[in-house]
Amino acid sequence: MTTQVVNVIGAGLAGSEAAYQIAKRGVQVRLYEMRPVRQTPAHHTDKFAELVCSNSLRANTLTNAVGVIKEEMRLMDSVIIRAADECSVPAGGALAVDRHEFAAKVTEYVKNHPNVTVVNEELTEIPEGPTIIATGPLTSPDLAAQLKELTGEDYFYFYDAAAPIVEKDSIDMNKVYLKSRYDKGEAAYLNCPMTEEEFDRFYEALIAAETVPLKEFEKEIFFEGCMPVEVMASRGRQTLVFGPMKPVGLEDPKTGKTPYAVVQLRQDDAAGTLYNIVGFQTHLKWGPQKEVLQLIPGLENAEIVRYGVMHRNTFINSPNLLRPTYQYKQRDDLFFAGQMTGVEGYVESAASGLLAGINAARLVQGEEPVVLPSVTAMGSMANYITATNAKNFQPMNANFGLFAPLEKKIKKKAERNEAYATRALETIQNFVNI
């Protein structure tokens, strides 16, 4: 057994998973958790992996990408998924848990491992030696300042302001056209033209739609230069037409005329399977958000893979800073995991901790860190956060749009998703003993 110790900072979903994966590989772990010495605005206990929002870990079926990532994690002995399975409550096709029992179970499994030493103190500096930073969206101010200094001000963020992302295959291409404003450079945007009547219908639905209530510690985010589209709309009907829906320079090639308003979609991934809705960061609830977006011509049947969100979230610009092993590019023995890396969601956070933990253990044991193929759910997430466009990087949930394309195109969605799942689980079998 190696005498080196790996520091893991944060005992949330990612940190708990990382600590467990390191410990079970015979490596000593020093797990730092500042609670209960210092609480966050969202936590209520000193337990590991406390779920601060929903008690659902989302879909549990293989027809959904997050169901696939769970199954991959089961195969790789995830402590988070094991505890969730043991503490599950009825939730249809989803995996929901008794949150108190779940946190207690994770705490028990991790804390009682002979290779784990828990240190209840707040770290304000990044330690030397092998370290995983998994401090989550509510990282303490002192450590956040250190991370900002490490990564550079331009690569460290304090909130999400993410526009919705849709699957390209679900866009009605007969209603949209490819063009850049004033034809500058290559045609890079899909444009959804609106008549005045279509815009009026969209506008009225937008300003009437229900928004998510802000938590007290989130109220400053709208003053950081990123306005939700519904707040812009509330300032007057023309605000959008002169803002994100500005039509000038975007003549419709079918008519030769400038539409009344235009919604632009920009490619979001290297494979060109996902498009984000430009300038549409929003705080609308997901149900109303879908109804409003489907009033946009061409998006009537759009499959939304990530809804627009605006909330407090400490994260880094992973495409510039991380490798798909979750290693920091400038320091091989420093890893990041969890929502701080730009993965979004309970399961995705734990999955990043699983891979970061495995790779930290491999590093101190003199083995090469592992890159999972992007045909797997875990590999596709690691690939997305490290290979996507750094300029417009925003956190992302697991979805099939991130997976490497299938060799053979399958038209029916259910069959296509099944093929993604089958290929992923066959591939992950090659990594279960790493």
UniProtKB/Swiss-Prot annotation:
The keyword NAD applies. Keywords: Cytoplasm, FAD, Flavoprotein, Methyltransferase, NAD, NADP, Transferase, tRNA processing. GO terms for cellular component: cytosol. It holds the Pfam family GIDA. FAD binds at G10, A11, G12, L13, A14, G15. The keyword Isomerase does not apply. NCBIfam families: gid_trmFO, PRK05335.1. Belongs to the MnmG family. TrmFO subfamily. This is Methylenetetrahydrofolate--tRNA-(uracil-5-)-methyltransferase TrmFO. It comes from Bacillus cereus (strain G9842). The lineage of its organism: Bacteria, Bacillati, Bacillota, Bacilli, Bacillales.
